[in-house]
Regions:
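Inter-motif core of Ras-like GTPase G domains
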Residues: 2-22
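P-loop NTPase catalytic nucleotide-binding module
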Residues: 20-175
Length: 175
């Protein structure tokens, strides 16, 4: 999604909606989003251009809530924004993915979460699990009982959320 006039593609099984990390939801994005709603297309969201000056992941996610009136579920958070963007944190697997700048991010390495981000990652993961738990009784029960929550608990709940278009997973990066 991202351009007006995609009616032929909206009859598909799903779509990835691209949003600008600097501008968030733009008018043409709203138009295409409404077309996808009309055709009941499940969607994932990708906040793009996180390496640009002025990129602000939290503001872009807030624009999804405010302008599209949807329930975004943040799945990744950026490691740095704008010129400082150097990777992402995968909230499901709790891993840092550092992109190599010499090949423009084509290669990467998995790493531990940077200590200075540990608290914000814990908080973001908690929000993700709570949002996913709305779509799975077993996940909700595990979470409420303080049991460890794994990928196998989270992914089916997110799938349900996406297929029912009740919530939209949000990823980020720079393509």
């Amino acid at each position: 999604l991202g351009a007006v006039g995609l009616d032929v593609h909206l009859g598909r099984n799903g779509a990835v909606a691209l949003f600008d990390g600097v501008n968030g939801v733009e008018p043409q994005s709203e138009t295409v989003w409404r077309q996808a709603d009309k055709y009941q297309v499940p969607r994932l969201c990708f906040i793009n251009k996180m390496d640009r000056i002025g990129a602000d992941f939290e503001r872009a996610v807030a624009s999804l809530r405010e302008r599209l009136h949807v329930h975004p579920i943040v799945m990744q958070i950026p490691i740095g924004w704008g010129p400082e963007f150097r990777g992402i944190i995968d909230l499901i697997d709790e891993k840092a993915i550092h992109f190599h700048s010499e090949d423009l991010g084509a290669s990467y390495e998995l790493d531990a979460i940077p200590p200075e981000m540990a608290e914000s990652v814990r908080e973001a993961r908690r929000h993700m699990i709570e949002a996913a738990a709305e779509f799975s009784d077993s996940l909700m029960e595990k979470y409420l009982h303080g049991e460890p929550v794994t990928r196998d608990d989270i992914v089916p709940a997110l799938r349900r959320a996406v297929l029912t278009r009740a919530a939209f997973p949000v990823f980020c990066g720079s393509s």
